[in-house]
Amino acid sequence: MDYKKAGVDIEAGYKAVELMKKHIQGTMRSEVLTGIGGFSGAFSLTSFKDMEEPTLVSGTDGVGTKLKLAFILDKHDTIGIDCVAMCVNDIACAGGEPLFFLDYIACGKNEPEKIATIVSGVAEGCKQSNAALIGGETAEMPGFYPVEEYDLAGFAVGIVDRKKLITGDKLKHGDVLIGIASSGIHSNGYSLVRKVFRMEKEALNTYYESLSGTLGEVLLTPTKIYVKALNSLKTGNVEVKACSHITGGGFYENIPRMLREGVTAIVKKDSYVIPPIFHMLQKDGSIEEQMMYNTYNMGIGMMIAVDKADADKAVSLLSVAGETAYIVGEIQDGEKGICLC
C-alpha cells in the first residue's frame, strides 16, 4: 500500500503546480517578494508611504453551489473569477485596493489540467482587480469529494488609508443611491436556481432568445468585479459615502449593512433594467417578488451612496469605466433599513 493507492497522487500535484505557474506569473506585482512554491507569500508595503494610516482590509468567500453547473457542463475556466470577485468586491466596499489573493481548491481527484484551468480563472480575476495571486492550496481528498467534483474558496487582502475607509458614517438625508449593474446572478442563490431549473446538460445547453444565450452560459456568467469601477470614482474625486456588495440576502440584507443608524434607503424598483434571467427564474419557480429581492442582486451588483451634487458625475465616470449605472433612489432620515417601492 502507498499514498497513490490510497487516492492521493503527489506527482499529479507537482504537475498541476507546473501547469498553473504561467497563469500565476501574469498576476505578479512589484511588491511581491516571494516566488511560487514557498511555504508562504510575502508582500511589501513600503510603496504605500503616502498613506497616513495604512490599514489592511480583508475578505474571504467561496463560489458555493454554482460549482455544480461547472461540473455538469465541464466548464472550469471562469469559476475562478467568481471566487476572486466575491472577495475583492467586499474589500472595495470598504474603499480598499486589493493587494493579493490566495486560493483553496479541495478535490476528490487531482486532475492537473483541470486544476490549472480553474487557476487560470482565478488569475484572470486577479488581473481584473490588480491583485497578485501569491499562494494557494490544492487538497486532494479521496473519499471526501466525488472524483469529478471540487470546492473553491479564496482569501484577499487590500489596503486603504484609514481616513478613507468607507463606513457609511457620513450619510445624510438627500444623498443619492446609485446601482451598478450586475453581470447576472453572480455567485449566490444557486441552491434555489438548481431547484427551479433542470440541472442536466441538455437543458443547460438550450438556447433562449430572451436570454440571448443558453441557460448554462447565462447561469455561469462570472461575477462582475467592481474594483476598477470604484477606482474611477476615486480618481474622479467623487466621494463614495457608503457601498454595498449585493450578494446572499439580496437587497434586504445587504443594503442595510452600508447604512448608519438613523437613515433609511429608498430604492425604486422601476429605476433600472432587471435582466431577463431573473424574470425567468421568478416565473419558472413561482417565487414571490420579496423573496427574489431577499435572495438575488436583481441586476444590481453594487450599490453606492454619493452626495446629490456628485450623482450625475458618478454615473458618467462609471459609464466611462465601462459600467452601466442607474440612479435608483436616495437616503432619507428614518429607521435603519430599506424601503423598496
UniProtKB/Swiss-Prot annotation:
Subcellular location: Cytoplasm
EC number(s) on file: 6.3.3.1
GO cellular component terms, A-Z: cytosol
Organism: Lachnoclostridium phytofermentans (strain ATCC 700394 / DSM 18823 / ISDg)
Family listed: Belongs to the AIR synthase family.
GO molecular function, one term: phosphoribosylformylglycinamidine cyclo-ligase activity
The UniProt record lists the keyword Electron transport: no
InterPro entries, per the entry: PurM-like_C_dom (IPR010918), PurM-like_C_sf (IPR036676), PurM-like_N (IPR016188), PurM-like_N_sf (IPR036921), PurM_cligase (IPR004733)
Alphabetical UniProt keywords: ATP-binding, Cytoplasm, Ligase, Nucleotide-binding, Purine biosynthesis
Recorded catalytic activity of this chain's protein: 2-formamido-N(1)-(5-O-phospho-beta-D-ribosyl)acetamidine + ATP = 5-amino-1-(5-phospho-beta-D-ribosyl)imidazole + ADP + phosphate + H(+)
Designated name of the protein: Phosphoribosylformylglycinamidine cyclo-ligase
Pathway note: Purine metabolism; IMP biosynthesis via de novo pathway; 5-amino-1-(5-phospho-D-ribosyl)imidazole from N(2)-formyl-N(1)-(5-phospho-D-ribosyl)glycinamide: step 2/2
Broad class of the protein's primary localization: cytoplasm
Top-level taxon in the UniProt lineage: Bacteria
